[in-house]
A protein has these predicted regions:
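Histidine-acidic residue clusters that define the catalytic metal-binding segment
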Residues: 100-140, 172-179, 208, 307, ...
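Acidic/histidine-enriched segments that form metal/cofactor-coordinating
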Residues: 27-130, 296-315, 319
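C-terminal regions of mature proteins
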Residues: 141-146, 265, 294-371
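M16/MPP (pitrilysin/insulinase) zinc-metallopeptidase core fold and M16-derived inactive scaffolds
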Residues: 1-54, 89, 110-113, 228-244
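M16/insulysin-pitrilysin zinc metalloprotease superfamily fold
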Residues: 3, 16-21, 45-78, 209, ...
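An aromatic/glycine/proline-enriched structural segment found at the starts
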Residues: 106, 110, 141-209, 311, ...
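Acidic/histidine-enriched alpha-helical segments
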Residues: 23-32, 67-85, 96, 149, ...
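Buried hydrophobic packing residues in well-ordered domains
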Residues: 8-10, 30, 43, 59, ...
Length: 371
């Protein structure tokens, strides 16, 4: 606490070279093998197979032996302060801050953010301490996808990352101790002189985490609401049928810390309330009337396509491996989950939406035209 922003500042400073190479020399080494190398809490390299060994050597050098030069720290800190100064008073930023304050109880770390004050308080030593505590092999997953054998990939990783050691105890965050705010309807309005229409977000915290039995059903419900573009339920009713909005979307996010569900739309100020009432009516219908089988099967097909199509690329395969590993999910568990998705019935989806969503408990944030 009091040093929010140290993580992003550390990421920025890692681009300033290593103990072996200064920033320009490091870039020259990666250019020599036509590699794209990026460093930070998310790190990686894209390179042809023949230069994988050298790319991994440079990647390990950047991750395990960053120089953290004082001059680079001063420049990076000033850059971050300038960015915060420019963004802090933007209406969209103020709206996002107000939303988090309304959604989460005092003491919840999700309310914390980098400010000019917290960033100004960060020292060069703070960056080194953060690096030592947060960049650890026991918090890292490395995925290699490409034209090589698994044995060669493992050998190269062990050669350059095998001596990476963790010091001290791994931090463990007790998520069950997070304070919970009782769900209740609130409205926050922020004026924006640059807007010609209102941008509205309805958002609520859901009583679930990754692995919840209702996860598959909520994914399908979100796909039905907004996953088919102009053919989605929200767009068809709020835009095409009623003419209340210019655009409409929904979002369902879930991880180990919790879950949120939101509906967002852009409308004329006079239609904000009517659009919300229509969106809430859709949710209530999903809670009270089972979907037609055809609609549910179409949503399943869309969701399955989003799962399968990215696996046609190296990046997609790598992201899939990392996502599953970070979630602690085995291939067998992933297969079981998708079998559950495909087997879900309209009645099961209806029951899950009724259990988890509270249409009367949205925090409403309105970014509206005005000075």
């Amino acid at each position: 606490p009091g040093r929010e922003g140290v993580a992003s500042l550390t990421n920025e400073l890692m681009r300033w070279g290593t103990i072996s190479y200064d920033r320009k020399a490091y870039e020259a080494e990666t250019d020599a093998i036509a590699a794209n190398v990026y460093l930070g809490n998310t790190f990686g390299a894209t390179v042809t197979s023949e230069y994988l060994d050298r790319a991994m050597q440079l990647l390990a050098d950047g991750m395990l032996r960053p120089a953290f030069p004082p001059a680079g720290f001063a420049v990076s800190k000033m850059k971050q302060l300038q960015t915060l100064s420019a963004a802090e008073h933007l209406p969209a930023v103020q709206a996002a801050i107000a939303q988090d304050q309304a959604l989460y109880a005092p003491g919840d770390p999700r309310r914390r953010r980098a400010t000019i004050e917290t960033t100004a308080a960060i020292s060069h030593a703070d960056v080194r301490r953060w690096y030592a505590s947060a960049f650890r092999p026991d918090l890292t997953t490395i995925s290699i996808v490409g034209d090589m054998s698994p044995g060669r990939a493992l050998s190269i990783v062990e050669r350059y990352f095998g001596n990476w050691k963790a010091f001290g105890k791994r931090s463990r965050f007790n998520r069950t101790s997070l304070p919970q705010r009782a769900p209740t309807q609130r409205t926050v309005t922020v004026k924006s002189p640059s807007l010609a229409q209102s941008q509205v977000t309805l958002k609520e915290v859901l009583p679930m985490r990754l692995g919840d039995p209702d996860y598959a059903a909520l994914l399908l419900a979100n796909t039905i609401l907004s996953g088919e573009g102009t053919g989605s339920l929200l767009f068809k009713e709020l835009r095409i049928r009623d003419g209340y909005v210019y655009s409409a979307d929904s979002k369902f996010d879930v991880d180990e810390d919790g879950a949120t569900f939101s509906i967002s739309y852009a409308s004329d100020p006079k239609d904000v309330d009517r659009a919300q009432a229509a969106a809430v009516a859709i949710l209530r219908r999903l809670q009270s009337v089972p979907l037609d089988d055809v609609e549910l099967e179409r949503a399943k097909a869309l969701l399955a396509a989003r799962r399968i199509l990215p696996l046609d690329s190296y990046d997609g395969i790598a992201r899939d491996v990392l996502t599953r590993t970070n979630a602690g999910e085995t291939p067998a568990q992933a297969d079981a989950f998708w079998h559950k998705v495909l087997a879900l019935t309209p009645v099961q989806l209806q029951a899950a939406v009724r259990r988890k969503l509270q249409p009367d408990a949205f925090v409403r944030v309105i970014l509206e035209p005005g000075a």
